[in-house]
Design a protein with these regions (language model features):
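Blade-level signature of beta-propeller repeat domains, shared across WD40, Kelch, NHL, RCC1
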Residues: 336-381
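Beta-strand-rich domains and repeat architectures in extracellular enzymes and scaffolds
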Residues: 34-71, 91-97
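Conserved Ser/Thr-centered positions that define the repeating blades of beta-propeller domains
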Residues: 74-75, 124-125, 165-172, 227-231, ...
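Bacterial signal peptide processing site
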Residues: 24-26
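Entry beta-strands of beta-propeller and related beta-repeat scaffolds
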Residues: 48-56, 102-108, 152-157, 208-215, ...
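C-terminal motif of bacterial Sec signal peptides marking the signal peptidase cleavage site
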Residues: 19-22
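Repeated scaffold domains used in trafficking and secretory/extracellular systems
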Residues: 38-47, 89-101, 139-151, 189-206, ...
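Short glycine/acidic-enriched loop and turn motifs that connect beta-strands
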Residues: 58-65, 110-116, 162-164, 217-222, ...
Length: 381
């Protein structure tokens, strides 16, 4: 379903280096409108050279701490999913996952719960068969793109207070050797932060040449808050949106690295936009009406998927393409994941401790797998 402003909006924006467009070129308004912050839920999927990963919550009520977050993987070349949640750490607070350095591993962070004040980490280089523990002595943010790793091994972690921590290598991250890259107040006080009225950081990533990036929610209407740390100074690095969005506050719900640059998911008023950067310019999709995002994620090729209300799901394959509505998803669908073959999607539906995998075949959802997760209700209370 396409939103009110039409489709196929391809616009040139600022690159990471020598940026002259985006929020850094505009002056903040004299009066500051209020902002209702939007973020993407933690349930998501991601694709690495090892395979396709999904993160979702199962079990029962979060109030009684019977919610248990799980990690599933479908190894590259395989058609079936496996439960590979790292053991030994309470995961009621949620899980955040990102591809590790060079795509040879996956890094999972545990959001604090049960009075923990830090975020345990786990790294696997064998599709979740074995996990090596690590530590972030702080609390990860409650967003799916709260961690990012560059091919060089440098790792970023977004904290719940909007600060960003950095580790020089994957080994340093696992050893708990993190240092402060910036804070929300410092980023908001920078030139691009002031000009867009930055109020929250929602995602971290890396751009070309391993440049650290951050994205968030801005008060100034019509401005997408994406920032790049080049040479120790933050610069505007986001897309310029078409004039039809000049009256909408824009919030970046997701940001990820792609083979050519970056992909982003943005909320602009009641619409969603996808955007892709090749490091020199951005291409912005046409809008799709939102009504609220219940889950979202990216494919390895820059594709984007979103779960919306009422069983709606929309996908877009990349620059120059349009949003496509999938058939209504099966009841309980918590996340989508790119299918094992060319094109298509899997829907991962949750009912208590049972995960049902549905595959989109010939325009209809077909049940292909059921995984019963051994959940010990009451073990966290």
């Amino acid at each position: 379903m396409i939103g009110k402003r039409g489709a196929g909006l391809a616009l040139l924006g600022a690159g990471v280096i020598g940026l002259t467009a985006g929020c850094g070129t505009q002056t903040a308004p004299a009066t500051t409108p209020s902002l209702h912050r939007q973020t993407a839920p933690l349930s998501t999927s991601l694709v690495t050279p090892q395979g396709t990963w999904a993160v979702t919550v199962m079990g029962g009520s979060a109030t009684s701490e019977n919610n248990f977050w799980q990690v599933f993987v479908r190894p590259a070349g395989a058609s079936r999913w496996s439960l590979v949640t790292p053991e030994g750490v309470a995961d009621n607070g949620g899980l955040v996952a990102t591809g590790g350095a060079g795509g040879t591993s996956v890094l999972v962070g545990f959001r604090p719960s049960q009075a923990l004040a830090f975020s345990p980490l786990a790294v696997s280089s064998d599709t979740g068969k074995n996990w090596t523990p690590g530590l972030l002595d702080a609390d990860l943010a409650d967003v799916p793109d709260a961690m990012a790793a560059a091919p060089s091994g440098q790792t970023l972690a977004l904290l719940s207070d909007g600060s960003i921590e950095a580790a020089a290598t994957a080994g340093a991250a696992a050893a708990g050797q993190w240092s402060r890259l910036t804070t929300l107040s410092a980023l908001a006080a920078s030139a691009p932060g002031r000009s867009c009225g930055l109020e929250a950081v929602n995602a971290v990533s890396f751009g070309i040449n391993n440049v650290p990036m951050a994205a968030g929610s801005c008060v100034r209407r019509g401005v997408a808050g994406v920032f790049a740390d080049t040479g120790g100074a933050w610069q505007a690095a986001g897309p310029v949106l078409p004039g039809g969005f000049g009256g909408d506050q824009v919030q970046v719900l997701g940001l990820t690295r792609t083979a050519d640059g970056n992909a982003a998911l943005l909320a602009a008023g009641s619409d969603l936009l996808a955007a892709w950067s090749d490091g020199g310019h951005w291409t912005v999709s046409g809008p799709v009406a939102s009504g609220g995002v219940s889950a979202s994620g990216f494919g390895a090729d820059g594709s984007v998927w979103v779960l919306l209300g009422g069983g709606r799901a929309e996908t877009i394959s990349g620059p120059g393409s349009s949003w496509q509505a999938l058939p209504p998803v099966p009841a309980g669908t918590a996340a989508l994941a790119p299918g094992a073959g060319s094109g298509g999607y899997d829907a991962l539906a949750v009912s208590g401790s049972k995960l049902t995998v549905w595959q989109l075949t010939a325009g209809a959802w077909a049940k292909v797998q059921v995984i019963n997760v051994p959940i010990q209700y009451g073990s966290s209370s």
